[in-house]
Amino acid sequence: MKNFTLLLCIFIITHFALAQTETNTSFASQMNTMFSPLDKNNVPQGILLDYGMEFTNVPAFNGTLTDSTYTNLTAFKQIYNTLLSSRIRDVTTGFVTPQTFDTNLKYSRTTNVITLGGLYFKYATFIDNATVNGKLTYSGGKFYDKYTNGVWQNPYQERKTFVLAATEKIHKGFNIQVKLPSSIFYSNVLSEVQSIEIDFGNGQGYVTVPFNQIVNVSYTSEGVKTWTYKLNLTSSASLYSRSRIKIEEGLTTIPWSERHGNQN
């Protein structure tokens, strides 16, 4: 009976994986057909959100803080996978395979250190009402570039997305070590990043967090803390992101003399 149950589980998992693969392949095939007439070299960064499979609302994470855009590890992965699937031409800068993404995340973690992962990307979308406004043609289930008097009409809007998130939701102890490994911060415009600052919600304000360096953070109380991330760009602009982490009091070590009294 146990063997049958095991085989059944393996069958279900395999069937689900194959079904998911077939769905992804079918979607990609449809998108390739629909967008095939377009000149892909005109797409900013070679990433078109309208072309990809959207796992989450990427434009919402545009560097402006809102109540609905707190980040976590799941949101980070969903945004990355959406951008990965939105590559309309062969661009590789800032990207790794989903398998490498998970591997990097796994091996970047260190005992007693909270690691952060994130991304900063530029990508494109169709402008609103592009077909109505004469910027794009849609005919026979396909998109076509629009030309007016021989002049190409630009239907694209370049956008930015920035997220950072801790790999843990709960931490025990008031003294924390935090690290942002460069191996799990992805960007197709990394040269635009000047610095990253974090307000850990402990009353100390923003502190600069360099890649691959330990930053010590202290709290005086338990509770859910909001970590606010600030991405400073070389253009002098700043983008923001934030996440939550629950801080719990850790074990308190009592000196031997206090536990057993004065032996003198």
Cite the ranges covered by each PLM segment:
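Bacterial Sec-dependent N-terminal signal peptides
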Residues: 1-22
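Extracellular/lumenal mature domains of secreted and surface-exposed proteins
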Residues: 20-264
